[in-house]
Swiss-Prot record:
Prevents the cell division inhibition by proteins MinC and MinD at internal division sites while permitting inhibition at polar sites. This ensures cell division at the proper site by restricting the formation of a division septum at the midpoint of the long axis of the cell. This is Cell division topological specificity factor. It comes from Gluconacetobacter diazotrophicus (strain ATCC 49037 / DSM 5601 / CCUG 37298 / CIP 103539 / LMG 7603 / PAl5). It comes from the Bacteria. GO terms for biological process: cell division; regulation of division septum assembly.
Length: 96
């Protein structure tokens, strides 16, 4: 499957997500201050995508929006648990 993806130039999810985020932030910047609902929805959707793949403690998520002269930056800090600790019990259960 990776051979087909490399032949047809399929983007991985990270660049696609980055492109979408850049488009949304550009739209929000051009619309002005009245678009706080868009940023709130964007934050919810980003967290929903991340929690589909890893367990996230909601208390350890920090979201910050900075607006400058021509740049808006959405910063999301998430403390990710160690993946090895989660994988070990699952591997042990599979052996039994």
């Amino acid at each position: 499957m990776s051979l087909l993806a490399s032949l047809f130039g399929r983007k991985t999810s990270a660049p696609v997500a980055r492109d979408r985020l850049q488009i949304l932030l550009a739209h929000e910047r051009s619309a002005g201050e009245g678009q706080s609902e868009l940023i709130a929805k964007l934050q919810e959707e980003i967290l929903a995508v991340i929690t589909r793949h890893i367990t996230v403690d909601q208390d350890k998520v920090q979201i910050k929006m900075d607006r400058g002269a021509g740049v808006s930056m959405l910063e999301i800090d998430i403390e990710v648990p160690e993946l090895k600790a989660r994988a070990a019990p699952q591997a042990a259960a599979a052996i039994k």
